[in-house]
Amino acid sequence: MESLTLQPIARVEGTVNLPGSKSVSNRALLLAALARGTTVLTNLLDSDDVRHMLNALSALGVQYTLSADRTRCEVTGNGGPLRAAAALELFLGNAGTAMRPLAAALCLGSNDIVLTGEPRMKERPIGHLVDALRQGGAQIDYLEQENYPPLRLRGGFQGGNVEVDGSVSSQFLTALLMTAPLAPQDTVIAIKGDLVSKPYIDITLHLMKTFGVEVDNQSYQRFVVRGKQQYQSPGDYLVEGDASSASYFLAAGAIKGGTVKVTGIGRGSVQGDIRFADVLEKMGATVTWGDDFIACTRGELKAIDMDMNHIPDAAMTIATAALFAQGTTTLRNIYNWRVKETDRLFAMATELRKVGAEVEEGEDYIRITPPAKLKYAEIGTYNDHRMAMCFSLVALSDTPVTILDPKCTAKTFPDYFEQLARISTLA
């Protein structure tokens, strides 16, 4: 297996221009495909997940052109639901941001489409979304294991009253919301249980509004969406930088700055993960906000005990930043780590112990006490981009760290390690 050893880093200082947001890129691509008119997306993320969405749209007959660096995409809208001319199988890798929204959108009208992916995708639950779509009339079959992909979709979604469980993934609700305006009837979505990752729903609602569709959001408990609508291209749309990707650089600044500045996001960002910077501030770092940047400067970091449900992806970065904080850090209400690219609670606990931390792994929380000195370790990444990026922070100690399968960052940030090296001075 390929590996990358990072030597100890004495200091980080500099500016990182963030790649486009994965969450925004894939939502914007799908809405542009469903819309009337041509949409030019700029600062689109070039990564595995986005390529899976682009390949799927192409197979569904959507016309688009990509710039040489794949960050500018001109999409010719379909002016309504996507149709496959014949039976079709779409391979979506491990891209939840493609699998969930397409599973819903392809239930409009009549299709015969199979959605499948990598082995890990077949372990990521989708039953709550399928249940909700079936309530609206969709015909969906599980081809292997009940409640998991691969799925066979044969259209039929009409709208009406549907109930969706919000406790596992906000992507299920995102998928329903984006599909509902094109259904023949109005859709009323009731949320069962606690809605996780609410800020990701805000991204969805913001993008739908950008494409001309308003949703009646009743305190995140009920969403009313009028049927028979059409998305309208906004013309040009700039994809903001990825706030989850920003977390690694901001944390590096907090631990070993200097000052690290990330551009492409700022105080007006639609992504909830920018709130990660508030957590660093709470731990003792100095944070500066601009319209198009966030900067973080080193401070004496202290442990925190916090509910992280609002920033589940960025919260992983706090788990490794906790290695540099005084005291025991507790991250709570993070059950949905277990259904991501890997079981992230198990993976994080396992690898933190390798570098010497004392870790308590609960069903939906993790408690981390750093060692006096970090130990050298080879870090397993579980084919999970965020594990690789989180554990790169171990190099901010006086101990090297080896990251196994470093190329798994291609899911969201292919040149992550180059960008980290650019702002680093080795010890």
Curated annotation (Swiss-Prot):
Q: Which domain of life is it from?
A: Bacteria
- Which EC class, in a word? transferase
Residues holding 3-phosphoshikimate:
K22, S23, R27, S169, S170, Q171, S197, D313, N336, K340
Cite the active-site annotation: D313 (proton acceptor)
What EC number(s) has UniProt assigned to this enzyme?
2.5.1.19
Q: Name one GO biological process term.
A: chorismate biosynthetic process
Q: Where does phosphoenolpyruvate bind?
A: K22, G96, R124, Q171, R344, R386, K411
Example GO CC term: the record gives:
cytoplasm
Q: Could you tell me which Pfam families the record lists for this protein?
A: EPSP_synthase
Q: How does it assemble?
A: Monomer.
User: What name does UniProt use for this protein?
Assistant: 3-phosphoshikimate 1-carboxyvinyltransferase
* Source organism of the structure: Klebsiella pneumoniae (strain 342)
